[in-house]
Amino acid sequence: MTQSLINTKVLPFKATAFKNGEFVDVSEKDIAGKWAIFMFYPADFTFVCPTELGDLADHYTKLQELGVEVYSVSTDTHFTHKAWHSSSDTINKIEFAMIGDPTGQITRNFGVMIEEDGLALRGTFVVNPEGEIKIAEVHDLGIGRSASELLRKVQAAQYVANHDGEVCPAAWQPGEETLTPSLDLVGKI
């Protein structure tokens, strides 16, 4: 079994991303002091990937309202991201950074590299303002992810971070009751 990345710091990285029609440099310094999502996917110009990224683009405004920056990452180059962004109506609506990781450094740092293929698994990681990974989810290549569930998880992670001693139960939504673990609760849930 591999070691969990939960509560570990994001390792240093430098990359070039395509964002808002420009190539921009991105590093771990860009996430300091804010919440961030890293969404790894296998490749541009494929099948499940645009459905996931389009879904995430539809939720980007809500995530930004929560102070969350989004980074999609594949082992394609930033040039390939630009070409895909220019040719696909679904991908064209993306406003978040599309990181090119052709060396696989970032993909390996997050433990989602498929070495024999040079591609990333479908990995999603939520990072807190201290640079610690708080949520890690990895899917098989054939299983797409839900941005609405990711939004809910981010809201839960932020709630727990701001409410010491409280935890969010399954399917928790903002405004619903949380739990405060104690001896009194044992066996009563």
What are these regions (language model features)?
Residues 1-189:
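Chalcogenol-based redox active-site neighborhoods
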